[in-house]
Amino acid sequence: MNLNATIFFQMLVFFVLGWFTMKFVWPPLTKAIDERRQKIADGLAAAEKGKADLAQAQARVSLIEASAKSETHARIIEAEKQAASVIEQARREAEAERARIVAQAAQDAAQEVQRAREALRDDVAALAVKGAEQILKREVDARAHAELLNQLKAQL
């Protein structure tokens, strides 16, 4: 029986050690394991949330990019329309200026022709008067008259 008392004390020490471990060692270990498990779960949740936020941000970026593209396209079209309008307006103004210059030149030419005609009439009238004076100063002779008229024709 010595063997029985040893086994009894070993069992008693085992149960005391088990109780001590359950009472003082086991709770901090389970608490640390639970905290670690919670940290891992929180990290995974944060990673999932970050992934979802990234997807939302990428969606917003693609929407903003599409909006910017369409806005840029619209601005380019508007600028082209405005440029065409400015060119067309300049063309109309140039055409009006050309027409005005041509009309002014035609008017100036007509006035110059009119002045030339007036000057020519004055010259013809002066020559006619001069010829009439010469005819009247000389005696009346058909041959002399014809010669004077030929000279007047040559001067005209």
From Swiss-Prot:
Membrane topology category: Single-pass membrane protein
Pfam families: ATP-synt_B
GO function term, MF aspect, one: proton-transporting ATPase activity, rotational mechanism
Compartment(s) of residence: Cell inner membrane
Gene3D superfamilies, A to Z: F1F0 ATP synthase subunit B, membrane domain
Transmembrane segments annotated in the record for this chain: 7-27
InterPro entries, per database record: ATP_synth_B-like_membr_sf, ATP_synth_b/b'su_bac/chlpt, ATP_synth_F0_bsu_bac, ATP_synthase_B_chain
Keyword annotations of the record: ATP synthesis, Cell inner membrane, Cell membrane, CF(0), Hydrogen ion transport, Ion transport, Membrane, Transmembrane, Transmembrane helix, Transport
Function: F(1)F(0) ATP synthase produces ATP from ADP in the presence of a proton or sodium gradient. F-type ATPases consist of two structural domains, F(1) containing the extramembraneous catalytic core and F(0) containing the membrane proton channel, linked together by a central stalk and a peripheral stalk. During catalysis, ATP synthesis in the catalytic domain of F(1) is coupled via a rotary mechanism of the central stalk subunits to proton translocation. Component of the F(0) channel, it forms part of the peripheral stalk, linking F(1) to F(0).
Family to which the UniProt record says this protein belongs: Belongs to the ATPase B chain family.
Complexes and interactors: F-type ATPases have 2 components, F(1) - the catalytic core - and F(0) - the membrane proton channel. F(1) has five subunits: alpha(3), beta(3), gamma(1), delta(1), epsilon(1). F(0) has three main subunits: a(1), b(2) and c(10-14). The alpha and beta chains form an alternating ring which encloses part of the gamma chain. F(1) is attached to F(0) by a central stalk formed by the gamma and epsilon chains, while a peripheral stalk is formed by the delta and b chains.
Name of the featured protein: ATP synthase subunit b
